[in-house]
Design a protein with these regions (language model features):
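Short acidic-glycine-tyrosine-enriched beta hairpin
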Residues: 58-74
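Short, conserved beta-strand element in jelly-roll/cupin
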Residues: 29-30, 39-56, 91
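A cytosolic small-molecule/anion-sensing beta-strand core signal
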Residues: 21, 49-50, 65-66, 84
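A short, N-terminal "cap"/entry segment at the start of jelly-roll beta-barrel domains
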Residues: 1-26, 105-114
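Conserved short histidine dyad/triad with adjacent acidic residue
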Residues: 10-11, 24-40
Length: 114
């Protein structure tokens, strides 16, 4: 079964699929505009499985397509967006909040295993 099918219904969902040492591997599906945020203590990696992610930075936008990846350096403010949606694998250290340094209605307190 496709792990993405186990995620909650909706435009935004995250699920934990693996841990390695102090890192978590998560799957994410997203459509729309996320919030501006940063991760002050860690880099963040997105590997796009399906669709297109537009990573917004204050000085530019980077389009990341299926089969491509992007690493967001620690401390860099960014805002993911996707008009038609994307599915991705997200790699970051264990316990990193999904909204980084910002609390919002998009913050997920505990990401569940799928």
């Amino acid at each position: 079964m496709d792990k993405f099918e186990k995620l909650p219904v909706g435009d935004y969902a995250v699920g934990l699929i693996a841990k390695m040492n102090d890192y978590e591997f998560k799957i994410v599906k997203f459509k729309g505009d996320f919030i501006w945020h940063s991760h002050p203590d860690t880099d963040e990696t997105f590997i796009i499985i399906e669709g297109t992610l537009v990573m917004n930075f204050h000085d530019r936008k980077v389009e990341v397509n299926s089969g491509e990846m992007i690493v967001i350096p620690k401390g860099v403010e960014h805002k993911p967006s996707s008009e038609n949606g994307y599915k991705a694998i997200l790699i970051e250290p264990e316990g990193v909040p999904n909204t980084g340094n910002v609390q919002s209605d998009m913050t997920i307190e505990k990401i569940q295993w799928v």
